[in-house]
């Protein structure tokens, strides 16, 4: 649920904001250049006028309010699992990934917590109706499991397909040709996914869903980073509506969670219930975007 508020800046700046706001002596020196000194009051005033200060404060209040309201329901094991999944996905590049996205390890884990807390709040406030579930059922597809070989050129992908046509093993070709270092050593197998999964290009998902068990793509699939060859491992039948209530409900929640209008209203309600208020007149508008239809008054 990646649309939820990004808290990467939190670690970089929020400590200073909190520290300065709670100081008993605003004239305490924080820095010096030449014979000039910068007091805490001067620094706080400058920080207060920065556009990012409102974003930082909003992130702090939202995270804090959600944690206060739903922290006891947070699955910490799932947060840790998600964090480790990112670490595994990026491998030796994980630290670079964090730096490029303005995260520390702590703030990145907070972002994951924030996503889970927001989803908990969403489920508390909204429930899919039977008609919504039936509408979701029309386009529902079960999760599938595939192997893939990721290449940077169409020619390489065509070479792979030709070798598959000649009876060579998909797993051995994945090991030899796939540029996906995370899956090339395990036959190119990917975790089960569905059409709602945003990790994969739509062309990849559409190409995969056309396959029956043990079939592979006869033409390279064009994706953002090159060309894919896909083999179907498990393509379950759709089943029946009565047995798929849980999956349909989760699919609807995932769609709602990616809708900024819906999530702003959800967060607005949490802020209202937690009696969030901003005392500083210069930062008063930090939560304006969440006042919306719930008419919250911060």
From Swiss-Prot:
PROSITE patterns in alphabetical order: PPIC_PPIASE_2, PROKAR_LIPOPROTEIN
Domain PpiC, residue spans: 141-234
E.C. number(s) listed in UniProt: 5.2.1.8
Enzyme class of the recorded protein, top EC level: isomerase
Any one Gene Ontology molecular-function term assigned to this protein's record: peptidyl-prolyl cis-trans isomerase activity
Lipid-binding residues (covalent, S-diacylglycerol cysteine): 23
Any one of the GO BP annotations: protein folding
Keywords: Cell membrane, Isomerase, Lipoprotein, Membrane, Palmitate, Rotamase, Signal
Function of the protein: Plays a major role in protein secretion by helping the post-translocational extracellular folding of several secreted proteins.
Name of the protein: Foldase protein PrsA 2
Lineage, top ranks: Bacteria, Bacillati, Bacillota, Bacilli, Lactobacillales
Gene, per the UniProt record: prsA2
